[in-house]
A protein has these predicted regions:
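Exported/periplasmic ABC-transporter solute-binding proteins
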Residues: 2-63, 70-73, 77-85, 91-95, ...
């Protein structure tokens, strides 16, 4: 198998460190991608996971990150407009959300949320986990899907909010809620998927999760190598396995 093109890029100094601020929906995909990149390139990756909105705020305030992998392109464009980035970045994935229901829950894994509506009326639903829509793109899309289904107003008192989509998925599967609206990329990870059942919510029920990444100003060569690596076929194959739609190489 050919090494990714990034193996030699920017590698004149025996490998550097790249600090990657990444949306939490990427957690499991990046746990596979980082070791591959490190082995191929000689660079090291320091990964900081969080909600895109919180990471954006940290970068805007001068946090020393080199690459920003956002779940919502709007945050990348804001940083570009503020002169914090090399360019306007590139689309690296389209994400999806769905309803995750843990084993033993009284809810059905129904992507059209009809059972959720019934459970709200008949009292089966006590708590539903979503990411905080104030700063997590996956939470905002969950809110839009619940609005589309006509459930948002009534379900708000039952919501338990995760700081980011990874925490929302923990709430959704740990028994602290009867279910949750989570990223498909997390539900497809075996360590999450085995905890329950998952059903995709129709993509046209919410704005797209247009995930964009950008190299930040003054980043070292290792940051560019990471960007190149993520556009390689090997990387795209891993992203697809976690349910992401990825641009053609």
């Amino acid at each position: 198998q050919a090494q990714p093109a990034s193996a030699k890029d920017g590698n004149e100094s025996k490998g550097g460190m790249v600090t990657v601020a990444a949306a939490s929906d990427l957690k499991f995909a990046l746990e596979e991608l980082v070791p591959l990149f490190e082995k191929a390139s000689g660079h090291r990756v320091k990964l900081v996971l969080g909600s895109s909105g919180n990471l954006y705020a940290q970068i805007a305030q001068g946090a020393p990150f080199h690459v920003f992998m956002s779940a919502d392109e709007g945050f990348v464009f804001k940083l570009a407009d503020a002169g914090k980035t090399r360019d306007r970045g590139r689309l690296y994935a389209l994400g999806r959300i769905g309803l995750m229901v843990p084993h033993g829950s009284p809810l059905q894994a129904d992507g059209e949320l009809k059972d959720l509506a019934a459970a709200l009326k008949d009292g089966r639903l006590k708590r539903l986990a979503i990411a905080n829509p104030e700063h997590a793109p996956y939470g905002m899309r969950a809110k839009e899907a619940l609005q589309h289904a006509g459930l948002w107003a009534d379900i708000q008192p039952r919501l338990v909010l995760g700081e980011n989509i990874s925490q929302a998925a923990q709430f959704a599967t740990s028994g602290s809620a009867q279910g949750g609206i989570v990223a498909q990329s997390l539900a497809l990870a075996p360590q999450v998927g085995r905890l329950g059942r998952f059903a995709l919510i129709p993509a046209n029920w919410h704005q797209p999760l247009t995930q964009r990444m950008v190299v930040l100003k003054d980043a070292p060569p290792a940051a560019q190598a990471w960007d190149v690596f993520l556009a390689s076929n090997a990387s795209l194959e891993i992203m697809r396995r976690y349910g992401f739609d990825v641009p053609r190489p």
